[in-house]
Amino acid sequence: SGQKVCYGDLKHSCYKIAYFQDLSRRVGFQEARQACEIDGGALLSLESEAEQQLIENMLQNLTKSGSGISDGDFWIGLWRSGEDLATTACPDLYKWADGSISPFRNWYTDEPSCGSEACVVMYHQPTANPGLGGPYLYQWNDDRCNMKH
């Protein structure tokens, strides 16, 4: 299930957002990746500021439309191997699950924190109090891959 939006003029012509209010239906990174592949797609690779803005606008419109989307982060296709790796090189080790080589990143302040957090979510917490980097909306955060989003 999920909201699907298609565009005729973009490299990635269709986007599908799957959001579950029921916490028991949320999944970890690998489960989300497999669900996308079974559905004929892939976890999102954000390759430019323009594409990031497109996704932000999509989420804003879905939130306004009464679709039930509220607080809940979204897995994107950025990850790194070596979950216990905490070196200064860590931010450069993230790669896109679909093989995209885009260097575009939209990390939240002080992210990625690395260590055991090797998979990446896009923040979507409109009701959360802002942190040092502002509202937790649309920036990226590394998280443990088994967390349910």
Language-model-derived ranges and their functions:
Residues 1-149:
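Extracellular, disulfide-bonded carbohydrate-recognition/adhesion ectodomains
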